[in-house]
Amino acid sequence: MMTNAYLLKRGRQGLDPVDVHGTLEYPGTVATDSGAYQILEYGQVGVTPEEIVGYQEKINTDIGVILDVPTGFRSDPSRARWTVDETVRRADRALEVMTRNDILWMGPVQGGVHLKEVERSAREMAKRDFAIYALGSPTELMETQRYDVLVDMIVAAKKVLPRGKPFHLFGAGHPVLFPFLVAMGCDLFDSAAYALYARAGRYLTSEGTQLLGDMVEFVCPCPACVGTSPEEVMRSQDKTGGTRLAQHNLWVCFSELRRVREAIRKGRLWELLELRSNAHPALKECFNRISQYAEILERSTPAVKPHGIFYLGSSSDNRPEKVRFVSKLPGSVEERRKLVLVLPGRWRRPFHEDPRYESVAKAFDDHPKVSICFYSLAWGPVPIELDETFPIAQTESSDAGDPVLIGERAKKVSEFLQRLHPKSVVLVSDGDYGRAVTKELSKTFAKRILTIFNGERLNPDAIVKSVERKLIRNA
């Protein structure tokens, strides 16, 4: 639970500080903000950085925040630079007067939409030993649905902050954003959006926001929604309806957090991002911006996961596992072999166990002069050496052909084979994808090098015998 230490102090002027857990009647972890939001709203507050630190220590907060100066959304570069410098100065003042090591102190990063200032702020805060680091000023970005800019801000801060410390995002309260924020490395959030939205009759879901007046019935199974209707909640809005709606909004926030954690456990967070990205154009922009940082995400993605992955089309091409595979592909095959046998990578995983081509792959798997490579719609060129590795053999994908995607994959296959400098290439063409690969390889390799077999017409034994004859001629 999070509350505002500045408002508590102002509301109890002249009274001795009391334990915040007792004030809230809540025995769990309590975090207290320092009044920075009030600075953003009103320009100043009547408290010093030293005073608010001392007050938070006296009320026994569990997580405390120094009194920073938010940059906001509309600050120009000069103002942004000043807020960063002033926040650093206030951090130093706060650190000098802290006496309790049992409180987790939070160091805010400022800079707003000015990414160089965000990075500079994060670098300065990283020099100071805070238990938690946080990014400020995102609220207006979220209200205007500039989620792509928020992603840039998070990356600018995260790349210079200590990796072993939690990262908090102030004001992130809409469940639709949780999967995206977690994917970018946010560990903690706080927001009063669940209550503020409820006052305005706004109903939160994991796919967006709805107005009660536009709804006929609730599809949510939470206790606040079962047994009532949007019309009934609207009629009682001044009495209990606002509370009921706030309860639903809070419930859906916790539900989405549980869904995100479960997706992480199963190694399916990227699939959740793909699903959520189709709920709104702004979320699609957010997803596309995250995809641009795929190489950064790859560094912290486990090499092996408890479950396989889903390939859902071109939106899956920037998932961290795919980026890792592409980066390691060039060094996966020896160039010394004279003949490359290119087989279809169809529905069966691993590809060499495909009933139609299993005997062909088996016949040449250990041949000293043959390299086997599969062409997969999800992965492009897949050397047999990687056929049983994660996540190639654990990928579920649809082979329904997108002509653009098929063409792009065929080019990747051709580019990979070029790097092997083979004396001969034998392609077994199968389906639309096989025909696209045929077209690309025909552009790349001379007729004396390239041999093409129709896998849909020839039986496996005929293919094996033809390849053997090709090897004899090359000897």
Please describe what each predicted stretch is.
Residues 1-46, 96, 110, 117-121, ...:
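Catalytic cores of glycan-processing enzymes that make or break glycosidic bonds
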Residues 1-100, 309-336, 343-420, 428-475:
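Non-catalytic, usually N-terminal nucleic-acid engagement modules in DNA/RNA processing proteins
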Residues 7-9, 36-37, 70-72, 112-114, ...:
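Short, solvent-exposed loop/turn segments at secondary-structure junctions
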Residues 61-66, 88-92, 103, 263-290, ...:
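Long, low-complexity, charge-dense
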Residues 88, 97-226:
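Glycine-rich phosphate/ribose-binding loops and adjacent secondary-structure elements
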Residues 192-285, 409:
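Gly/Ser/Thr/Ala-enriched C-terminal appendages of enzymes
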Residues 286-289, 297-300, 462-464, 473-474:
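Non-catalytic terminal extensions that flank enzyme cores
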Residues 289-322:
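Flexible, glycine-rich loop/tail regions that form catalytic "lids" or insertion modules at the edges
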